């Protein structure tokens, strides 16, 4: 899986900015993966939003991932779904969505990472690397050291997430991350496209 700048949409953190607008501006700034994350909207609303983002990602040759909602991901022919430890079990998701459909899994320990790879995950979301206020149930920060430890044990791509900004992103990549997932450092910026471009440029030169 080709990694790069991975943007997660969140309308709560970016009031007045829709999922579609976040995706559009992030893609114009060089994002390679967009994840739609919304725990509030009903299925019909999410489906309509996901269709729009799917189209945008296709235009920009980027991947589109849906958080948690495998049904929505399959319905709009998204590239994949991202699952947390308390979401639909990886084994069940893989039965419903064989490869090349992408399944990413959030992990916070080496053991979870190894199990996810063995279970058929295509990439790992590792974090929170640094303290973050983006996700209330994110747990304690694990630091770049966990990325190094996981990198030694698994072969699938690692996407680092949690408290990542332009100051610490280089350290995360140096620790072995294949990509970085960014939320507030981009979507809370007054210029989402410009903020995305800075991260994309940093990754190219790291």
UniProtKB/Swiss-Prot annotation:
SUPFAM superfamilies: Thiamin phosphate synthase. One of its GO terms (cellular component) is cytoplasm. Its cofactor is Mg(2+). 2-[(2R,5Z)-2-carboxy-4-methylthiazol-5(2H)-ylidene]ethyl phosphate binds at residues 132-134, 163, 183-184. 4-amino-2-methyl-5-(diphosphooxymethyl)pyrimidine binds at residues 35-39, 67, 106, 135. GO terms for biological process: thiamine biosynthetic process; thiamine diphosphate biosynthetic process. Keywords: Magnesium, Metal-binding, Thiamine biosynthesis, Transferase. Its EC number is 2.5.1.3. InterPro entries: Aldolase_TIM (IPR013785), ThiamineP_synth_sf (IPR036206), ThiamineP_synth_TenI (IPR022998), TMP_synthase (IPR034291). One of its GO terms (molecular function) is magnesium ion binding. This is Thiamine-phosphate synthase. Pathway: Cofactor biosynthesis; thiamine diphosphate biosynthesis; thiamine phosphate from 4-amino-2-methyl-5-diphosphomethylpyrimidine and 4-methyl-5-(2-phosphoethyl)-thiazole: step 1/1. It comes from Methanospirillum hungatei JF-1 (strain ATCC 27890 / DSM 864 / NBRC 100397 / JF-1). Binds 1 Mg(2+) ion per subunit.
């Amino acid at each position: 899986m080709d990694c790069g700048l991975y943007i997660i949409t969140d309308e709560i953190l970016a009031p007045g900015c829709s999922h579609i607008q976040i995706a559009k501006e992030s893609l114009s700034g060089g994002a390679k993966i967009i994840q739609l994350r919304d725990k509030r909207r009903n299925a019909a609303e999410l489906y309509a939003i996901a269709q729009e983002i799917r189209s945008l990602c296709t235009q920009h040759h980027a991947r589109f991932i849906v958080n948690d909602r495998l049904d929505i991901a399959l319905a709009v022919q998204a590239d994949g779904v991202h699952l947390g430890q308390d979401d639909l079990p990886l084994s069940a998701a893989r039965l419903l969505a064989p490869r090349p459909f992408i399944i990413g899994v959030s992990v916070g320990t080496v053991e979870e990472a190894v199990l996810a790879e063995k279970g058929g995950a295509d990439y790992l979301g590792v974090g929170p690397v640094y303290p973050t206020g983006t996700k209330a149930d994110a747990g304690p920060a694990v630091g770049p050291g966990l990325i190094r430890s996981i990198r030694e044990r698994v072969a699938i791509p690692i996407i680092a997430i949690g408290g990542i900004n332009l100051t610490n992103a280089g350290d995360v990549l140096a620790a072995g991350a294949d990509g970085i997932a960014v939320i507030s450092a981009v979507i809370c910026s007054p210029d989402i496209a410009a903020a995305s471009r800075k991260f994309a440029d940093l990754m190219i030169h790291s």
